[in-house]
Amino acid sequence: MYFFLVQCLYGDYMNLIYEDKKIKIVDCNTFFSRLKGFMFKKDIQHALLFNKCNSIHTFFMKSNIDVIMCDRDNNILYYYNNLSKNKIIFPKKNVDKTIELPVNFFNIKINTKVRID
């Protein structure tokens, strides 16, 4: 039921895979889903994908998040661990997509790849 509601609010969900772990990821492909993101959410159980996004903010967030910024080929260019609320990540060069996810779900290393299925 939870993922049905997530799909209704945000859009389609897939799997984000890194090394041998995976988590559900929702493609935020509507204006509302991109605007809301994880704002006002306490319990984060999935990841969010923002295509064509090279900057984010954490205003109005209730919990910390991890942020992965990738190029078009899903190479990890930037990784922000345990990003707290009321922060801004200014635009980064060569970033094509941004992924927000629960804190410490993956042990991310720069210059590796994520897979989205």
Q: Where are the predicted features?
A:
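Compact, glycine-rich, soluble single-domain proteins
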Residues: 5, 9-117
